[in-house]
Regions:
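Short amphipathic alpha-helix segments
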Residues: 63-78, 329-346
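Mobile "lid/hinge" segments at catalytic clefts and subdomain interfaces of large enzymes
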Residues: 169-250
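A common structural junction motif
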Residues: 76-81, 110-117, 346-347, 376-382
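Terminal amphipathic helices with adjacent charged low-complexity linkers/tails
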Residues: 239-296
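Conserved small/polar residues in nucleotide/adenosyl-binding loops
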Residues: 402-408
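Active-site cavity-forming subdomains of large catalytic enzyme subunits
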Residues: 131, 136-200
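Hydrophobic or amphipathic alpha-helical targeting/insertion segments
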Residues: 92-126
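Short glycine-/aliphatic-rich beta-strand segments at the starts of folded cytosolic domains
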Residues: 43-62, 312-329
């Protein structure tokens, strides 16, 4: 099958539900728990105190092209947004939004290809991808086109049967495994031979578990069969009764261990193939792109003088990527305004968001580097400053983990 392209404007009608629920919540006609159950499915949550909202902007594969960057820059200036946050799922969040602004931006985002639908709640979340896919020296192959096709396919589940909990899918292009594909709900880890190893039912949090390697040497065009099998597994064996044990990693226990889980997965995969639906992917050659030459060295930092160790060579001759790690993943919003001004005339320039809440500006020419380095100069300087952090309990309404504090402290 050809890649299923999701048209953002097709989701516009859905946002009427979000609009109505948000209005009722801010009028005091809907309680916070009920509102969360609705708003989460649109990538938005009320912040602590219930007087402001967060909006999570889905960026499949962490790709923020110039159109999306312009939308973000314009929104920051137009609505005077004072707080933004980069996430570990390679998305960007607007914070401290009032009722009118969150309703407006959720719909306006569709015009530049940003769909917030499914950004929270029990839905497939943003598909994560190694941030330098397609440009990284030494990568096994460019996984990005396949990940984007997977992201579009996963969006079709949003209007399907209710999942037990959220479903996170990740792709990695090298053994560095920056997206933690080996312990996602479903992970595709690239191999040197141009295929994927597939991992299922992994995850962190309470009772963390590595994913079960359910398949090796899976051809790239077959990935949708494995996504569909995972979907069927989650519907069949996920825990709908206890949310604390509803994430996919608990299915390993439910089914009697890793081997039993693998057997059940293969049974679902067989059923999916017998359905007769053609899920074999066909991508245009231009989207797949050329691969790096075998034996190519990994991307390395260049220009180490004057702080230029944030610049990395790409596998495309004469092009560079600039890395920026805002402290706490929460840069001054003006950064995105200034970045757009600095790179809007650079052919092919875009941002790639990373799982550690940093980002790269890619496809820079040598003559572009000084300007990009200047705009991003407020980047972390130490390992401590590169620590990954959520937006914080003073802003969001987190689940309470205080019962874990004492045992954890004692172990340390």
């Amino acid at each position: 099958m050809e890649q299923m392209k999701i048209q953002p404007e097709d989701w516009k009608e859905d946002y009427k539900e979000f609009d109505e629920a948000t209005e009722k919540f801010y009028k005091g006609e809907m309680d916070a728990k009920t509102y969360k159950g609705i708003s989460g499915g649109f990538g938005s949550y009320a912040q602590r105190g219930g007087n402001a909202s967060m909006l999570r902007l889905r960026m499949s594969g962490g790709v923020m092209d110039l159109a999306k960057l312009k939308f973000i820059a314009d929104a920051i200036e137009t609505y005077h947004i004072k707080r933004v946050h980069l996430t570990t799922c390679q998305t960007l969040q607007f914070h401290d939004l009032d009722e009118a602004t969150v309703k407006t931006l959720a719909v306006e985002a569709l015009k530049c290809g940003i769909v917030t639908r499914g950004g929270g709640g029990d839905f497939p979340r943003n598909v994560t991808v190694s941030p330098l896919s397609g440009i990284e020296k030494g990568e096994y192959f460019n996984v990005l086109p396949w990940a984007l096709a997977a992201a579009d396919y996963l969006m079709t589940y949003i209007k399907g049967p209710k999942l037990p909990r959220k479903l996170k899918v990740g792709f990695s292009n090298t053994p560095a495994n920056l997206t933690h594909a080996t312990f996602r709900d479903l992970g595709f880890a690239a191999r040197e031979d141009g295929t994927f190893d597939v991992y299922s039912a992994g995850g962190l949090g309470n009772n963390p578990a590595f994913g079960v390697k359910v398949a090796e040497k899976v051809e790239k065009d077959q990935i949708l069969y494995y996504i569909e099998a995972m979907h069927q597994m989650f519907l069949a064996y996920g825990n709908y009764e206890n949310r604390a044990k509803a994430r996919s990693r608990y299915m390993q226990q439910t089914l009697g261990g890793a081997e039993k889980y693998k057997e059940a997965f293969w049974e679902k995969l067989k059923e999916v193939r017998e359905m007769g639906k053609n899920l074999t992917l066909t991508l245009p050659e231009a989207e797949v792109g050329c691969e790096a030459e075998a034996g190519c060295d990994a991307s390395t930092a260049v220009f180490t003088n004057s702080g230029r160790n944030r610049v990395y060579t790409q596998k495309q001759p004469g092009l560079y990527s600039v890395h920026c790690h805002p402290v706490g993943g929460t840069p001054d919003p003006s950064l995105f305004v200034n970045l757009y001004k600095a790179i809007c005339e650079i052919p092919g320039a875009e941002l790639r968001l990373c799982p550690d809440e940093s980002f790269y500006v890619i496809n820079c020419r040598e003559e572009d580097l000084e300007a990009v380095l200047h705009v991003t100069e407020d980047s972390a300087k130490t390992i401590f400053e590169e620590s990954v952090a959520c937006i914080g309990a003073h802003v969001c309404q987190p689940v309470s983990y205080t019962h874990l504090t004492l045992p954890t402290t004692e172990r340390v």
